[in-house]
């Protein structure tokens, strides 16, 4: 991708300051809503939730919206053609990214802090680089491995701190989160061509709908009765589905209409800081020099990798 391509908005040929400001506003709201997800999940665990029940509650509230949107999109002949041609592939890739990666991520939250989870997931661009290098033979540009190394050092600082204060389960939780980030990176690479062929909205609806159906089937198979769950857990699960899944996806889509890819990617860099603020104020998680330095390293690492794309 050339610099001239990156400097063009995705759908607008003109970007007056009002459009840019609106785009930044939408992108920041989307990033903020995505970033408070770990806090909601930690609270859900406190009210007796587990990975499957939390995902099931999120699916109950989000999947109907995506299904309605999908049928709305299928009014167009082009979308119906793309659905028939790419629907199975989109469903498969969606289950990989929206079910398996999400399951590992939520399972990890039983063992690690919200701040550490967000930083581990935030490092997924490093896996995209490594997979592209090893599998697709795309040589990273100079300085990329240095940026990746700094990001891992930042995470290691927080893991070291949390191991001394929480225990060795930190390693299990970190491993689950890293696996989630790796699978999400695979999902991004696999979805890139599909999104260009069928459009991001239709792909997202099919992927989210398929993943949601899988988790609902799993919850029924495991005998989880949503009605018998703690009312506060149900409320948190619904909030996860609406405020941390559906709404941010719409806000990010709206931002994509008004911002260049580089502008959009920069707004996501505030995510770990937003998670830290809510984790400290709501969950009373500690924030030490280890966390501050680790966060700086990770954010710098990701920003550096994005600049080299």
Annotated model-derived regions:
Residues 35, 39, 95-99, 103, ...:
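Hydrophobic/small/kink-forming positions within alpha-helical transmembrane segments
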């Amino acid at each position: 991708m050339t610099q001239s391509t990156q400097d063009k908005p995705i759908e607008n040929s003109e970007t007056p300051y009002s459009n840019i400001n609106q785009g930044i506003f939408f992108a920041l709201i989307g990033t903020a809503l995505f970033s408070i997800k770990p806090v909601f999940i930690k609270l859900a665990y406190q009210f007796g939730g587990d990975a499957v029940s939390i995902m099931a509650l999120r699916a109950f509230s989000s999947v109907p919206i995506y299904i309605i949107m999908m049928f709305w999109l299928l009014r167009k002949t082009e979308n119906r053609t793309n659905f028939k041609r790419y629907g199975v592939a989109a469903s498969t890739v969606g289950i990989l990214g929206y079910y398996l990666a999400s399951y590992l991520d939520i399972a990890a939250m039983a063992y690690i802090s919200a701040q550490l989870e967000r930083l581990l997931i935030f490092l997924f661009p490093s896996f995209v680089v490594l997979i592209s290098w090893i599998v697709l033979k795309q040589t990273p540009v100079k300085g990329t491995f240095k940026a990746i190394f700094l990001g891992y050092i930042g995470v290691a600082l927080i893991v070291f701190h949390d191991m001394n204060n929480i225990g060795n389960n930190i390693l299990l939780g970190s491993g689950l989160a890293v696996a989630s980030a790796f699978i999400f990176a695979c999902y991004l690479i696999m979805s890139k061509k599909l999104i260009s062929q069928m459009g991001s909205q239709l792909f997202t609806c099919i992927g989210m709908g398929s993943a949601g159906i899988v988790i609902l089937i799993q919850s029924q198979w495991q005998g989880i009765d949503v009605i018998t769950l703690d009312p506060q857990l149900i409320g948190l699960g619904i909030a996860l589905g609406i405020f941390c899944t559906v709404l941010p996806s719409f806000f990010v889509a709206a931002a994509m209409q008004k911002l260049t890819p580089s502008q959009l990617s920069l707004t996501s860099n505030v995510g770990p800081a937003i998670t830290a603020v809510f984790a400290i104020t709501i969950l009373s998680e500690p924030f030490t020099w280890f966390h501050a330095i680790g966060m700086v390293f990770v954010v710098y690492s990701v920003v550096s990798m994005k600049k080299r794309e």
